[in-house]
Design a protein with these regions (language model features):
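C-terminal cap/substrate-recognition subdomain and adjoining C-terminal extension
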Residues: 35, 48-107
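Alpha-helical substrate-recognition element adjacent to the catalytic core
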Residues: 1-72
């Protein structure tokens, strides 16, 4: 895993998350980075380079495209263990019985 130096990793989504307030999310990501966290971007689909460049301003955080995989799996395959996810669609991050409706909430 790429975050074996003891640092924690935060992953941001693009569409529906970062795109809602790019300047704000950039500041938040910088706060994480300046506090020693590793910042990555995990998106479900390919993004135009121009869009990525505009979003990240001067930062050079890795962008991982999950495609058909759950985002956690895509990040893992890219060598990252994510500790905190910032995403408007948590069901795209990892398999979750509660979100599927077969959890124990109704027990």
């Amino acid at each position: 895993m790429k975050n074996t130096t003891g640092s924690l990793t935060v992953a941001f989504d693009i569409d529906g998350t970062w795109t809602l307030a790019p300047a704000l999310f950039h500041q938040i990501a910088c706060l994480f980075a300046n506090s020693g966290w590793q910042v990555i971007i995990v998106t479900g689909r390919d993004q135009p380079e121009r869009k990525i460049a505009g979003m990240l301003l001067w930062a050079s955080w890795p962008v991982i495209v999950s495609g058909p995989l759950l985002k956690e799996e895509a990040a893992r395959r890219a060598g990252y263990k994510v500790n905190v996810w910032i995403d408007d669609m948590p069901g795209m991050i990892q398999d979750c019985r509660i979100l599927r409706g077969d959890g124990l909430l109704n027990a």
